[in-house]
């Protein structure tokens, strides 16, 4: 079975694009840490809330408007305040099922050093790849839209340990993907 992969980095660096290529070309399945948060949102808000969509909520302090991404961040952090590893515990249940079925997994939403540490405990063979791009390139890719930038999940990844780095600033998607495959297959490819 192929080695599990965790992709870590800022918004717009190319993590999801690389994950989608692993799914398409190598039979991986995306299994995100935030999938559990999405399921909670779907239970409360029938169709869920898209990352860029806005939603008006009533709080004790009054009404507030949040994007779907901000709502996910707040729910994620509120539960992490109770149990730092709660969402990883939820993730590990699904991971175990995939592993037992022989399905390789890519996680493209690793955000915190504690998540990397716990992933390594749960799956010692996992390769953690830092995906990076210059801020201007990321801004352009996201059409200038960043949401939830003040959240720890948007900056916490910087302190996480990783096994390889792919800087997507000046390389093609194909070059970045080739570097990722080389890292997975045992090369120490850093682009």
Task: Label every model-predicted segment.
Residues 10:
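P-loop (Walker A) phosphate-binding loop of NTP-binding proteins
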Residues 15:
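Conserved lysine of the Walker
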Residues 18:
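Hydrophobic positions on the alpha1 helix immediately C-terminal to the Walker A/P-loop
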Residues 24-31:
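Post-Walker A helix-loop "phosphate-sensing" segment adjacent to the P-loop in P-loop NTPases
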Residues 35-104:
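ATP-dependent small-molecule kinase phosphotransfer cores
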Residues 66, 130-187, 191:
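Small-molecule kinase domains that catalyze NTP-dependent phosphoryl transfer to phosphate-bearing small molecules
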Residues 90-142:
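ATP-dependent NMP and nucleoside kinases share a basic, alpha-helical "lid"
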